[in-house]
A protein has these predicted regions:
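Short S/T/G/P-rich N-terminal loop/turn motif that feeds into the first structured element of a domain
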Residues: 1-49, 53-166, 170-186, 200-225
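Accessory, usually C-terminal, subdomains that scaffold auxiliary metal cofactors
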Residues: 186-193
Length: 225
């Protein structure tokens, strides 16, 4: 079940207005979109991150499902008053015409059952496209160990859009900060080495804050039944 992820500028003062729009849509329209399984929206610094999970074979099919239905198009029109376009980061070295973030790493390769019942955490940094292979290699080596099991990670996806790096993890535990903090407290040297290796590849988006985005909206298909 691929995630369609869009990113742009956002003023967090508008959280209530955006939440109202989404609640109305997902309460009235989403139940008629049986292949839409989950929607989550996060804010971080001056950004929004809008994630949609669709029951689709791949990201291309999911994108068609998310954009072809005129009801979804009307929702996007309503959100456009609050979700703005974001220019590429200064050192971005990739395309600027993609409508959604590109996923370049996923673990595990198999679908996760009942994914809509999990809780997502989004870490925001920056990255150049040329580093995709190295970042993917580092995570693949780590995910081949027991670290994901110890951390409680059920799925890991990494996306890139105009230089904005998004590390998305799905957990059974609702408190992402608690889960992530526990890993730091335990101090597994393999995890700390991974962080050190990644630091040179994924500089912070906001050097003044932490990298964890705040989820302010969530809807899952089961909740509509």
């Amino acid at each position: 079940m691929p995630s369609i992820v869009t990113v742009g500028t956002f003023d967090s003062d508008n959280v209530a207005d955006v939440t109202k729009i989404l609640r109305e849509f997902d309460g009235e329209v989403a139940p008629g979109l049986p292949r839409l399984r989950r929607r989550q929206v996060f804010h971080y610094s001056d950004l929004y991150v809008h994630m949609q999970d669709w029951d689709a074979a791949d990201a291309d099919e999911a994108y068609r499902l998310a954009t072809a239905d005129p009801r979804c198009a009307r929702l996007n029109d309503s959100l456009a008053a609050y979700f703005g376009d974001h220019a590429p980061t200064p050192d971005w070295d990739g395309p600027v015409d993609r409508p959604t973030a590109e996923r370049f790493y996923v673990w595990p390769a198999e679908d996760v059952e009942n994914l809509e019942l999990t809780y997502s955490a989004v870490i925001v940094n920056t990255q150049r496209q040329e580093h995709n292979a190295e970042v993917a290699r580092l995570f693949a080596e780590s995910d081949a160990t027991d670290i994901p099991l110890t951390m409680g990670t059920l799925r890991r996806q990494i996306y890139l859009w105009r230089g904005i790096y998004l590390h998305i993890q799905d957990f059974a535990e609702p408190d992402a900060i608690k889960v992530i903090s526990a890993v730091w407290t335990e101090g597994d040297p393999r995890f700390l080495q991974l962080v050190d290796d990644l630091t040179r590849l994924i500089p912070p988006y906001d050097p003044e804050g932490n990298s964890l985005a705040t989820r302010f909206y969530h809807w899952a298909a089961e909740e509509s039944k």
